[in-house]
Amino acid sequence: MTSMSTAATIKLPYQQQQHHLINSNNSYIQQQQQSPQQHHQQSVNINNCNNNTNNNNNNNNNNNNNNNNNNNNNNNNNNNNNNNNINNNNNNNNKQIPQQSIQTHANSILQLNKTMPHVNPPQQNHIMNQQQQQQQQQHYQQQQHPHQQQHPHQQQHPHQQQHPHQQQHPHQQQIQQQQQQQQQQQQQQQQQQQQQQQQQQPQQQQPQTQSTQERKWDEIKIYSDLIKRFALEASHLTISKENYDDLYNMAFCLFKTVDSMDPDKMPMNMGGNSRKNSFDMYNNNNNNNNNNNINNNNNNNNNNNINNNNNNNNNNNNNNNIVYNPYGNDGPTIPSPHLQHQQQHQQQQHQQQHQQQHQQQQQHQQQQQQQQQQQQQQQQQQQQQQQQQQQQQQQQQQQPQYHNGMPHHMQQHSPESMDHQRIVKLPTGNQNNNYSNDYYSIQAVHSPHLGPSMHLQQQQQNQQNQQIQQQHQQIQHQQQYSQLPIEQQQQMMLQQQQQQQQQQQQQQQQQQQQQQLQQQQHHQQQQIQQQQQSIAKQQMPQQQNTPNNGSPSSSDGKSPVNSNTAITSNNNNNNNNNNNNNNNNNNNSTTPVADPQKNFSGEVFFDDIGQDKPQRRRRRTMYSSRRNLKCHYCEVTETPEWRRGPDGDHTLCNACGLHYAKSQKKLAREKELEKQKELEREKERENTRKHSIDFMLMNDTSSAPTNSQNPTPN
């Protein structure tokens, strides 16, 4: 019975009251059976007890209402302190409440309790009430008669007093002592369970958050590495659609995990505190939910009346960030060393992350400084080059050269004439501008982001600088010549003129040579074209004048000259070669041509009908299925080597194929003769038409004077 009662009271304190009522009723029935003479007196006592319990319940409800009001005030003060603590924690990039803020908050609440002694936490109030009840019970038991004891329902409130006429049986004393022992055990078990729950809740929260955050960071690292690999491979490979979809999905997963991360735990590179303000409400809500759960557990374990439960459920919206110690005056609970170790570990991780970020920023700044130094060095080198060029120009000015009234060095391009581009030498090679193994890169002076207006401004500035330099050079040039005597000036002028004449002569010679080369090339091209035209002209009349036998003959019917015979034979050979090449191209479109040395059968067949010479080819694989077919003419089963049409509908043997080819040649020649005859007939018809028209016109002109009224026929 004791174990069952303890289990019931741990879950629901209201069941404890029912259990006590049942025990009291059972004891009352036993008492009736043992002493029926005292029935009337005990019934009176029970009625009085019930009245007292009702009064005490009312008093308890009133006191609980007062306590709830006080708790509301205390909770409001706690909310203000909690909001300040949460803001401080967010600024420190920590989601959990640190130990210092808990201690400061606890001290502030203890000070409030000292100033207002009637205000106590709900758990402490309940414990103090129980202690007062036990003390008063002991005091009353000492004053009472040994046969008179209080009913078990009267132990709930200290203001309950015993009626002087109440008396109980001595057997009931033992039951009451057992019940008191059970209650004490239950209270101790409740306190132990509360301590365990309070220690387990923060321990469960931290590993879950740490594990989820570590998983997310691992996912982010994996996705970022994969995306980097894809990007590197994409620079020298073509991406298929599947790879592109994979890359898109990985990027989407990465951004999704980054969005779900806490910005306070993220490093600065990933946008650490950029979205901090948007997460303040989220952090406050999480803290409030955790505190509400703690308050619910405390209220459900500490209240013994239904009214108290209802009142405390109404107070769930009030937030208490401090977990109270069940022993009352010992102050707030001290977190376990495991939690302290985890907090220290997290703080160390944050410090390491901040140090890494600081180091990265320093490295970035150092790189920028190095780049700036390199740019300055390049600018200094360019300035040195310009100074060297100016010195060379000054040396040349000591031996001036005039061309058309202007000095020669004025014709040279200044180093600033390159408006848009400048040559920047890469680290390898020498500084000289010789065409060696040195590598140069042309860099644009103006950035692509500059508009056309900036581009024009740069051009104008360059032109102004050129004009200023020219003026300075002219002044220096005049000063040098003004210092020299007249004779030396004349000699210098003569030397310059001679040099200029020599240069002009050299240029003229070069131009003449180029013209000669162009003329030679032009003559060669003309000769080649003439030869081609002559060959084409010779081929045309020979094709027209060839008779049926194919022997060359002239239009007069005589044998041609020896010189012409050689030309005609060459032309015929060329025609045959052209036909063979055309046949090769047509055959390659159907089947690939192998080497002539391999799989050569030595058998003869024709591809086209009107060909002069047979062409030796390999046996085709397309005829392998027709080995047992009959010839279309002689109907003899032989290997078919001839075909009639391009589709290969009719197969022929070797003899019939030769006969078929000859017959086809005859047909082709007959068709050509018919065409020629038709052309001659058309010419004759045209001639006859012309004669008839002329004859008609002559008749019209002769009959014109007679028929003066109708000169034209109707």
From Swiss-Prot:
Taxonomic superkingdom: Eukaryota
Coiled-coil stretches: 661-694
GO CC entries: nucleus
UniProt-listed InterPro entries: Znf_GATA (IPR000679), Znf_NHR/GATA (IPR013088)
Biased composition (Polar residues): 271-282, 550-569, 699-714
Gene Ontology MF terms in the entry: transcription cis-regulatory region binding; zinc ion binding
PROSITE patterns given in the database record: GATA_ZN_FINGER_2
Biased composition (Low complexity): 30-94, 130-147, 169-180, 283-322, 340-362, 457-476, 528-549, 570-588
Biological-process GO terms, alphabetical: regulation of transcription by RNA polymerase II
GATA-type Zn finger ranges: 631-656
UniProt biased composition (Basic and acidic residues): 667-693
Region annotation (Disordered) ranges: 28-97, 115-180, 266-362, 394-419, 454-476, 528-621, 667-714
Extent of Basic residues compositional bias: 148-168
Protein name in the entry: GATA zinc finger domain-containing protein 10
Upper taxonomic lineage: Eukaryota, Amoebozoa, Evosea, Eumycetozoa, Dictyostelia
Gene it is expressed from: gtaJ
